[in-house]
Swiss-Prot record:
It catalyses: L-aspartate + NH4(+) + ATP = L-asparagine + AMP + diphosphate + H(+). It is an enzyme of class 6 (ligase). The lineage of its organism: Bacteria, Bacillati, Bacillota, Bacilli, Lactobacillales. InterPro entries: aa-tRNA-synth_II, aa-tRNA-synth_II/BPL/LPL, AsnA. This is Aspartate--ammonia ligase. The keyword Acyltransferase does not apply.
């Protein structure tokens, strides 16, 4: 049992270390330290889809403030790029750990404990557009494939990803599969192509509903791009044979500028957020234009090692019935 446990841990470390090295080199970012707590009221917390309640923390020696365990570092990263004067084309990545206790379900792919490569870059002049988003997606996908090939060479786990990732807009997807749910659409398109970047998540589609929820103040999901489509964000999805479904590895996007922020908070009824320090800084032009996202570490390891449950590659909390159903839960 000990031998198996140690081997399991070595595999996990190999995937994480290999991916980190490739990501830093190919995306041209520096690894930095990030926070676990966010001060309530400064607007730095990531509100995700807007329904999740963060873990609240009181610090004994700072009695006049309340803190929350971060959901992600989407806003902190942009603030940090501005604070330390990162130039165009430069960026950072954080080995982020977070808690999301309001997950709808604790299942094969969802855990209370979240670990991500949380990255952000300053956009070069004139490149706040769909072409640059796609270029960045292709870079990250190359990192995923290089890591998969390294895993194949070391552990004899056959590489399955296609050489190229396929791009499709959510508007195209709902037109192609009008009778399917968003998740069913993802399954259909990802099974066909193997790896997909789904563009434009957060805005209302022609069927009257968004593909999925997104907070209004980090990704730009409203800017018109091409052919009447909208959104400068999206998800990297791969086909997971172990689960028989599409599998999200990353959510990312070009971040809101002043106009997109004002437009999106009005659409979601979150204008009160504009009173936060972070949002004021953005509206006053103090932040650079950026692109960023999160790449799930445990999800990446789970996929590349062909595991059936995320609990096989991370230590978290699970209902007893989950532990009873899977022998290799950590």
């Amino acid at each position: 049992m000990k031998k198996s446990f140690i081997h399991q841990q070595e595999e996990i470390s190999f995937v994480k270390n290999t991916f980190t090295q490739y990501l830093i080199a190919k995306l041209d970012v520096v690894e930095v330290q990030g926070p676990i707590l966010s001060r309530v009221g400064d607007g730095m917390q990531d509100n995700l889809s807007g329904t999740e309640n963060p873990v609240s923390v009181n610090v004994l020696k700072i009695p006049n403030a309340t803190f929350e365990v971060v959901h992600s570092l989407a806003k902190w990263k942009r603030h940090t790029l501005a604070r330390f004067g990162f130039n165009e084309g430069e960026g950072l990545v954080v080995n982020m750990k977070a808690l999301r206790p309001d997950e709808d379900s604790l299942d094969q792919t969802h855990s209370v404990y979240v670990d991500q490569w949380d990255w952000e870059k300053v956009i070069p002049d004139g490149k706040r557009n769909l072409a640059y988003l796609k270029e960045t997606v292709e870079t990250i996908y190359k990192v995923i494939r290089l890591t998969e090939l390294a895993v194949e060479a070391r552990y004899d786990i056959e590489a399955v990803l296609p050489k190229k990732i396929t791009f499709i807009h959510t508007e195209e997807l709902v037109a192609e599969y009008p009778d399917l749910t968003p998740k069913e659409r993802e399954n259909a398109i990802t099974k066909e192509f193997g790896a997909v970047f789904l563009i434009g998540i957060g805005g209302v589609l022609p069927d009257g509903k968004p593909h999925d929820g997104r907070a209004p103040d980090y990704d730009d999901w409203t800017t018109e791009t091409e052919n009447g489509y909208h959104g400068l964000n999206g998800d990297i999805l791969v086909w997971n044979d172990q689960l028989g479904s599409a599998f999200e590895l990353s959510s990312m996007g070009i971040r809101v500028d002043e106009e997109a922020l004002k437009r999106q908070v009005e659409m979601t009824g979150d204008q009160d957020r504009l009173a936060f320090d972070w949002h004021k800084s953005l509206l006053n032009g103090l932040f650079p234009l950026t692109i960023g996202g999160g790449i799930g570490q445990s999800r990446m390891v789970m996929f590349l090692l062909r595991k059936k449950h995320i609990g096989e590659v991370q230590t978290s909390v699970w209902p007893q019935e989950v532990r009873d159903s899977y022998d290799n839960i950590l």
